[in-house]
Amino acid sequence: MLDVSKRNCVARFADELAARHGGVDIVLSNHYARVEPEDDPAEVIDHYVEANNLGTTSILRHFAPLMRDGGRLLVIASRAGSLRALAPALHSRFQNLRSLEDVDRAVCVWRDAVRAGRAPGQVWPAWINIPSKIGQVAAVRVLAGQRRVADLSRGILLASISPGLIDTGASRPWLDLAGAPQPDEVAAPVLDFVLRPLTDESLYGELVHVGREEPGPFGMPIRAGSVVPWQ
């Protein structure tokens, strides 16, 4: 078990894999610290961000250099990872970021606002999952901007994944999941996406929807294999 909220653990694990195997072929970052509607965001935000956001950037930071030719480095996020899920006044917080450190700082500014009780007045969503997912997608986009040419020349795909609505204990308290698939039903299309050859370079660095076609939250349907708009 790897505790991604402890960044030294992520670094040690990456070093161990490099020493034993010389590199990695597939990394799926799919960790999630759940929250319940009755939780006080100010009380849970620190661990939530450490695991879901700083843990994600730590994985990207330490595993991207280890990817072998044809590798896949994918972050399981959500269609809520689009800036369109945020109030327009907040979009600039996640635009024009140049490094993973910039992403961490942007996320921590939001975290501090939640911790101090200022988030509602700054029109941040009440559900902390939304800014967190946007931070994950922003991290992938920033790293992709740095690695695109080199990665594509080696057949490496770096992207974030929207698996669609899934009936899980983490989502059930927040969403109407009537008819939503179970996790094992979603695993197959995700693995198909991971294992198939990279034939569409436009997916690199993007948030790619691989689940069922769903009514989009942005006024359009989201189809399997399509890119969820960033803004």
Predicted regions and their residues:
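Flexible, glycine-rich beta-alpha linker
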Residues: G81-L83, R148-L177
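Hydrophobic positions on the long internal alpha-helix
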Residues: G55, I59-F63, M67, A139-V140
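Rossmann-fold scaffold of SDR-type NAD(P)-dependent oxidoreductases
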Residues: G23-V35, N52, G70-S78, A159-S160
